[in-house]
Amino acid sequence: NQYDIIICDYSLGKGKNGQQILEELRFTQSLKHRAIYILVTAEATRSMVFGALEYKPDDYLTKPFTPVLLQNRLDNLILEKQFFEKVYEALDNGHYEAAAEHAAVLVNQNRRYRVASLKLQGQALLQSQQFELARQLYHEAMEHRRQEWACIGCARALIGLQKWSSAIHVLSELIDHGTENLQVFDCLAEAELALGRNGVAQAILERATVSSPYGILRQINLAEVASANNDYLAAEKAFRRVIKLGINSCHDSHEHSLG
């Protein structure tokens, strides 16, 4: 079944939690871009928030909240979904080039959604593997103001172009400026691995898993990199976390127990 709005509590008793449901919906591509997913939780710890936001819910509400707050958030999200309807429809159908074209048309139509339009255009260009066009878009956005989302997008485009050192330069600058965005660490580790600097990549992933210990895919990546580095103590520690996080997760695998 397809739903327009999903409001899901993090704590659902036995079985999956709200984050794992969103994780599986993203992984199986069962959640349409046009749908709204709001994650609700009573906890607001740093690691919990980081873990939840990694799977990009449309909004994140901490209890207690008022009906007025919920209504305002829903109203704003519905307006945004309607504005980007053609873009989301193209993304849902895997028509990434068309999605990029639709987003480009919308960039100057509503100042409120200008940045969101650029983000969607860049995302669609990356997904359609138009890496040079994506790099140009993000570079132009960075020239106006050095925004983090544009820097990350530029780095992802550079990785797509296999310009590893250039990507590392952009990402390292973000880290030097104190970024907490975990995409930065994931992309940086990917670039370092491509250059054969596995030890550096492992250190980057270890740092990221301290900030967000609930990200199972990153823990899996760390375990595999540590194993390749013959750092069996670190690998065992990461695999133990993976097994624990894998309970009720769509990413659970018996192979993790053998790691």
What are these regions (language model features)?
Residues E132-G259:
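Flexible loop/N-cap segments at domain edges
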Residues K81-Q127, Q136:
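Alpha-helical segment of the N-proximal tetratricopeptide repeat
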